[in-house]
Amino acid sequence: MISDEDYKKLLKQFHKLSDRHILVLETDMSSSDVQKVVVLSDKIRKAGNELVGLMRKHYDQLKRTKRYRKLLYLYGNTENKSIRKNLAIQLNDMQKQYNVTWDYCRTSMIPIGKKYGIDAIFALTKAEDIWRGIEKCLYDNGKTLHFSKYEDLPCIRAKQINRGIPMSVKDDKLQFKLGKTSFGIQVNDKFQTDEVNAVLDYLVKPETVDNKAINTLIEETYCIDTYRPCY
């Protein structure tokens, strides 16, 4: 018998290991509702640009310091693991000192999101996107953070089916809600029909499907397709 705590850990592990794929569907929104979505997306773009400007300022200050550049050089040219570990600690300390951290990025987005009237989950998701860009600059081959141009509208992502864009089932159909706007989807071919039906089947009995997924992971070290919606 698996305890509740172990069950949650295994389910989280399954979600990390399992494959993901994107299903693109059209909504049945009216043109006026589509315009509202465009307005929201532009607000997210503006909020993101404001956060990018703030984080780029701190990042530029950090990389201009001789000590940070020296530490980066030593870290990249040292093979000794213990020395690299010590250098990594020093680099992280400097990143904290100059507010180039995920925590600072996340908390800075809170007042910015409120300023533009953006739902907290959309603001958090945008902050995560920006932080991934910062990580590329810090640890990979990214050169600089970029602003989103006018009409370069970002996706509106909620990540969770009960926040931001709640998903529900009504009359055996997927229903969504964005703010006060409710809408469905258009299913145009057999592939989309099969995919949507698989999602509906999961939503009817999520615990049963999750249990099967966990048992398969434990017994066969294999991830089955559950069609759990995550967006």
Give the ranges of each region predicted by the language model.
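Nucleic-acid substrate recognition interfaces
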Residues: 1-231
